[in-house]
Amino acid sequence: MNAIWIAVAAVSLLALAFGAILGYASRRFAVEDDPVVEKIDEILPQSQCGQCGYPGCRPYAEAISCNGEKINRCAPGGEAVMLKIAELLNVEPQPLDGEAQELTPARMVAVIDENNCIGCTKCIQACPVDAIVGATRAMHTVMSDLCTGCNLCVDPCPTHCISLQPVAETPDSWKWDLNTIPVRIIPVEHHA
């Protein structure tokens, strides 16, 4: 019985020693992240869609901060994100790059024609936000609440059963453009 307690104590002491060494090393050799990259990454929409030409939002933020990449390449974020980044970096706003120049693009969502889906899982592997569910050789479907409309699942599909369709506007999804609605003050009469 003493041998078991000695072994437990030895392993515990080793774990404590290695933990202390790793803790010291993580603080001693820590690499400071660029605070500008952190702030830009917080502004970006985190859709990880790759439409900017980078594999995700963090690499795009690093390219903006370190390599002087254009600030206008985030299609999902649109003009609002570009303006926030321009303000943060104190640079001139730029017109949106490429297809993102539409002022109010309709939100798109991937739709799978489930009758033609062969269950190859290529779309699941391509989706950066895990919005597609299904199993091998079984029907797949898209969870529209999670889909960012990034278009990355369309090309890998061998049966071409995936398409992007605009999301229908409902009272729940309607966004009022309060800057274009004419507003006037109506005087109120007080009656005694």
From Swiss-Prot:
Keyword Kinase included in the entry's annotation: no
Function: Part of a membrane-bound complex that couples electron transfer with translocation of ions across the membrane. Required to maintain the reduced state of SoxR.
Family: Belongs to the 4Fe4S bacterial-type ferredoxin family. RnfB subfamily.
PROSITE patterns, alphabetized: 4FE4S, 4FE4S_FER_1, 4FE4S_FER_2
List of residues binding [4Fe-4S] cluster 1: C49, C52, C57, C74
Cofactor binding description: Binds 3 [4Fe-4S] clusters.
Upper taxonomic lineage: Bacteria, Pseudomonadati, Pseudomonadota, Gammaproteobacteria, Enterobacterales
GO molecular function: 4 iron, 4 sulfur cluster binding; electron transfer activity; metal ion binding
NCBIfam families recorded: PRK05113.1 (NF003475), rnfB (TIGR01944)
Name of the featured protein: Ion-translocating oxidoreductase complex subunit B
Organism annotation: Escherichia coli O81 (strain ED1a)
Positions with a binding annotation for [4Fe-4S] cluster 3: C127, C147, C150, C153
Enzyme category, top tier: translocase
Oligomer and partners: The complex is composed of six subunits: RsxA, RsxB, RsxC, RsxD, RsxE and RsxG.
InterPro entries referenced in this protein's UniProt entry, alphabetically: 4Fe-4S_dom (IPR007202), 4Fe4S_Fe-S-bd (IPR017896), 4Fe4S_Fe_S_CS (IPR017900), 4Fe4S_Ferredoxin_RnfB (IPR050395), Elect_transpt_cplx_RnfB/RsxB (IPR010207), RnfB/RsxB_Proteobac (IPR016463)
Reported cofactor(s): [4Fe-4S] cluster
Residue stretches making up the 4Fe-4S domain: 32-91
